[in-house]
Amino acid sequence: MSTLTKSDMIEHLMSHLNLTRQEGRCLVENFFDELSESLIDGKEVKLSGFGNFELKDKNSRPGRNPKTGEPVAVSARRVVTFKTGQKFRQQVDERLFDQ
């Protein structure tokens, strides 16, 4: 299994949309900036046909230091989760079973 990077996305935009490297980089960076800013501002991000980025609040809880085994308190925090859309999930499942 390989990894898709921002550079790969830029290369794809360059070849498929005939963009310059600078235009492709600007498009990719602006997309991720907008996504990040929306989440930082407390908004959910819904990408139709792909999935949703949601904010979840985690309560504080007891935990352990893995090195020492000593009990520690894990503070409350907000985390970003991603839930795949049904259409995208089906496409991934179909691709896995076709291989």
Curated annotation (Swiss-Prot):
Gene Ontology annotations for the cellular component aspect, listed alphabetically: cytosol
Keywords: DNA recombination, DNA-binding, Transcription, Transcription regulation, Translation regulation
Record's keyword annotation contains Transcription regulation: yes
Gene3D superfamilies found in the cross-reference section: IHF-like DNA-binding proteins
UniProt GO MF annotations: DNA binding; structural constituent of chromatin
Transcription regulation keyword on record: yes
Residue stretches in coiled coil: none
BP term (GO), one: DNA recombination
Family matches, as NCBIfam families: PRK00285.1
HAMAP family: IHF_alpha (MF_00380)
UniProt subunit comment: Heterodimer of an alpha and a beta chain.
Role played: This protein is one of the two subunits of integration host factor, a specific DNA-binding protein that functions in genetic recombination as well as in transcriptional and translational control.
Family, similarity comment: Belongs to the bacterial histone-like protein family.
Protein name: Integration host factor subunit alpha
Protein source organism: Psychrobacter arcticus (strain DSM 17307 / VKM B-2377 / 273-4)
Taxonomy of the source species: Bacteria, Pseudomonadati, Pseudomonadota, Gammaproteobacteria, Moraxellales
